[in-house]
C-alpha cells in the first residue's frame, strides 16, 4: 500500500524500545490503526508533543509488515490542552478514549461514525460549555447505538410494547426498559426524570438534558455504565475515576456473562503508555 494519509484521534501510547512508541489511533477512513512513531521519546523528536492522547491530527503513514510507521503529523485540534488542567473533564475524556479503544476489536475496520462521534465529544469536553458527565453519558449511549447494544428506552426490550411514555422498570440483562409482564427479578425503577434524560442523551436533545437535576444525572450514569460494561463483559478502568458528585448507584446485573473486573489501573488506563486496541462511531442526525 505504501504511503497513505488520514485524520485520527490518539487513543493511547505504548513504549517500544528506548526511543519509540506505538501509537493507537482511531482514524476517519481506516478505523483503528496502530503505528510506530520512531524517536518520539527523544527530546529532539520531530513529532514534538503532537502525538499525545486526545490529539486530533492529520497523518501520513507508511504500511509496514506488522505495524505501520508514522512519517508526518500535523495537529488539527489539541484537545488535551483543554482537559489536562480540569480533573472532571480529563477523567471523562479518558473514559471516552478507553471506550473507543474497547469497542473496536479489529484494526483497519472502517469506523467513520464512531470517529466523528469521538471528535465531537472531545470538542464538547474541551470547549468547557457542557457538563462533562452529560457529554460522557451521551457518548456512551450513542456509541452503544452504533455497536448495536442500545438499551430499550421507550419500548419493552422483550416484547416491544411501547410505554406511556415509558415503562416503569429497567433491567440491564434484559436489554433496558421492560414492561410489568416481562420484568425479570432485580429490575430497577428509574424516576421519570431519569427516563427523560436517557432519551434526551440518546437523541442529542441538550435542552432537555441540561434541564435535569443531579439525582437524574447520577441514576442515568449508573444505568449507562452498567449497560455498557455488561456488553463489554469487563469493567472500564477509567470510569471509577470519573468524579461524579454523590457517587453513581450500583445496578444489579443479575447473572452477568462473565464480566471481567479490571484489577490493574496501570498500563495506560488513563491515557498513558499502554498496550491495547479499540475504536467507535456517531448516531446519524444526532450532533453533540
Where would I find each of the regions flagged by the language model?
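Non-catalytic alpha-helical scaffolds and adjoining flexible linkers that form interface surfaces
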Residues: 1-22, 26-288
Amino acid at each position: 500500500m505504501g504511503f497513505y494519509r488520514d485524520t485520527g484521534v490518539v487513543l493511547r501510547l505504548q513504549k517500544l524500545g528506548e526511543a519509540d512508541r506505538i501509537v493507537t489511533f482511531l482514524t476517519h477512513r481506516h478505523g483503528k490503526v496502530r503505528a510506530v512513531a520512531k524517536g518520539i521519546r527523544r527530546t529532539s523528536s520531530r513529532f514534538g508533543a503532537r502525538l499525545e492522547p486526545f490529539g486530533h491530527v492529520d497523518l501520513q503513514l507508511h504500511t509496514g509488515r506488522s505495524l505501520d510507521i508514522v512519517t508526518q503529523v500535523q495537529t488539527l485540534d489539541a484537545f488535551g490542552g483543554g482537559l489536562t488542567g480540569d480533573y472532571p473533564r480529563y477523567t471523562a475524556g479518558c473514559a471516552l478514549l478507553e471506550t473507543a479503544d474497547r469497542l473496536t476489536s479489529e484494526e483497519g475496520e472502517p469506523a467513520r461514525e464512531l470517529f466523528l462521534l469521538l471528535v465531537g465529544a472531545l470538542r464538547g469536553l474541551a470547549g468547557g460549555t457542557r457538563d462533562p458527565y452529560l457529554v460522557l453519558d451521551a457518548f456512551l449511549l450513542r456509541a452503544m447505538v452504533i455497536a448495536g447494544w442500545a438499551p430499550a428506552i421507550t419500548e419493552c426490550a422483550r416484547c416491544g410494547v411501547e410505554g406511556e411514555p415509558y415503562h416503569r422498570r429497567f433491567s440491564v440483562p434484559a436489554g433496558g426498559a421492560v414492561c410489568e409482564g416481562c420484568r425479570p427479578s432485580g429490575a430497577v425503577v428509574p424516576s421519570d426524570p431519569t427516563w427523560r434524560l436517557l432519551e434526551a442523551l440518546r437523541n442529542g436533545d441538550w435542552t432537555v438534558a441540561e434541564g435535569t437535576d443531579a439525582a437524574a444525572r447520577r441514576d442515568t450514569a449508573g444505568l449507562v455504565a452498567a449497560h455498557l460494561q455488561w456488553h463489554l463483559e469487563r469493567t472500564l478502568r477509567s470510569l471509577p475515576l470519573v468524579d461524579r458528585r454523590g457517587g453513581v448507584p450500583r445496578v444489579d446485573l443479575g447473572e452477568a456473562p462473565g464480566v471481567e473486573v479490571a484489577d490493574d489501573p496501570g498500563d495506560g488506563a488513563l491515557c498513558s503508555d499502554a498496550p491495547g486496541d479499540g475504536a467507535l462511531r456517531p448516531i446519524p442526525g444526532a450532533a453533540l
